[in-house]
Amino acid sequence: DAEQHGEVALKDANAKLQDLKAALQQAKEDLARLLKEYQELMNVKLALDIEIATYRTLLEGEECRMSGECQSSVSIEMVHNTTSSSSGGSGALGGGAGGRGGLGSGGLGSGSLGSGRLGSGGRGSRASRGNLALDSSSGGGSAVRGSVSNSGGSCAVSGVGGRGSVRVTQSSSQSQRSHHKL
């Protein structure tokens, strides 16, 4: 009788062990799915942070230029590598005064940086010059090289391994101007 009781307890323990193994496997699959979703969201966040920083820097430079107090040199550098891939896309980093551009389908967050122009636009000003060209690099990264002309400046994006990073710098030099009323 005790032997039967022991066998039943062993079967119950094995059944619980199998249930726990199945639950562990399901949890691992869920964790992998959530990690992939998190990485995709972080790629989108990085792209949006880049776009926000670019527009902020360009706006500050344009305000300074329009006030005539300084000449601005804008330098934007973004390094990004992604392991996800896209079936193509037409997104653009930036956009002109007409509001075209932005992150399109298959934009930077999906593994490719769309072709387009990086322009300042707005408040009746002309868009800054600066074409961006897409270069593919090994390892799933994307690279864009180009320049932005807002009284000088440059934009360089390189695909490298590791996590993405953004660096936006702006240097201004005061120009002495005197206005005389006649």
Curated annotation (Swiss-Prot):
Residue span of region H2 subdomain: 67-86
Residue spans of biased composition, Low complexity class: 144-158, 165-176
Superkingdom assignment: Eukaryota
Region V2 subdomain, residue ranges: 87-162
Entries under InterPro entries matching the protein: IF_conserved (IPR018039), IF_rod_dom (IPR039008)
GO cellular component: intermediate filament
Residues under site feature: Stutter: Q4
Region (Tail): 67-182
Region (Coil 2B): 1-66
IF rod domain: residues covered: 1-66
Segments of this protein annotated with the region E2 subdomain: 163-182
UniProt keyword list: Coiled coil, Intermediate filament, Keratin
Biased composition (Gly residues): 104-124
Region (Disordered): 104-182
A Pfam family it matches: Filament
Family affiliation: Belongs to the intermediate filament family.
Miscellaneous: There are two types of cytoskeletal and microfibrillar keratin: I (acidic; 40-55 kDa) and II (neutral to basic; 56-70 kDa).
Record's subunit section: Heterotetramer of two type I and two type II keratins.
Designated name of the protein: Keratin, type II cytoskeletal 68 kDa, component IA
